[in-house]
Swiss-Prot record:
Pfam families tied to this protein: His_biosynth
Protein name: 1-(5-phosphoribosyl)-5-[(5-phosphoribosylamino)methylideneamino] imidazole-4-carboxamide isomerase
Annotated compartments: Cytoplasm
GO cellular component assignments: cytoplasm
UniProt family annotation: Belongs to the HisA/HisF family.
EC number: 5.3.1.16
HAMAP family: HisA
Main EC class the enzyme belongs to: isomerase
Metabolic or biological pathway, per its Swiss-Prot or TrEMBL entry: Amino-acid biosynthesis; L-histidine biosynthesis; L-histidine from 5-phospho-alpha-D-ribose 1-diphosphate: step 4/9
PANTHER family registered for this protein in UniProt: 1-(5-PHOSPHORIBOSYL)-5-[(5-PHOSPHORIBOSYLAMINO)METHYLIDENEAMINO] IMIDAZOLE-4-CARBOXAMIDE ISOMERASE
MF (Gene Ontology): 1-(5-phosphoribosyl)-5-[(5-phosphoribosylamino)methylideneamino]imidazole-4-carboxamide isomerase activity
Amino acid sequence: MYILPAIDLKNGEVVRLVEGNYDNKTTYFKDPLEVLDFFIESGSSYLHVVDLDGASDGETINFKTIEKVIKKCDLFVEVGGGIRNEDTIKKYLDIGVKRTILGTAAVENIDFTNNMINKYKEHIAVSIDSRDRMIAVKGWKEINKQDSVEFCMKLDSMGIDTIIYTDISKDGKLSGTNLDIYKELREKISCNIIASGGVTFEDEIIKLRDMKINGAIVGKAIYEGKIDLKKIIEIAKQ
């Protein structure tokens, strides 16, 4: 298992939202390069980056900022937010992004998703963001009525390499993640699963690791000093 520290970008700044609410945000750094050095020094091999403006508007608003991050580090970087066509996938892969994350596009256009999975294979992940088991899209502003676990099973049958699953109700609250949903997912799908949303405590990392979850995205818990990044990276590897 591996840890992906998170950088969420809004207008080029590193922020965290609570339950995906764009009006409830905290700005931690004006420049993502400030926190990138800390991630590298802590032993990170992976980085999760989200263009929050892109997730909401469907445009790659923070592309130049993300390109700056890529040039500064040698990490495995995955990027999501506003990736809704193949040109954007190519654009990110061309600057050195290792994995591009489909969200809204995956839910709203399953044929496109299937084509991208077949063409780009491990360079494509799908992010499933769930509220009360239903899928949220467009920066979590709209609820799609599909059952999130059933949709994950559909993606798994299509050959998706990696699913990132977020329980929105837990996100940004520092109250822990939804371990039950990851247990259910691991029992029902065989692809790689990355846990996201509310991961706050060391014992959660141990439990996720032991249930064979492949990765965990950690954001606010790092920024607020609730968790030791260096330590959880080592725990995840055990």
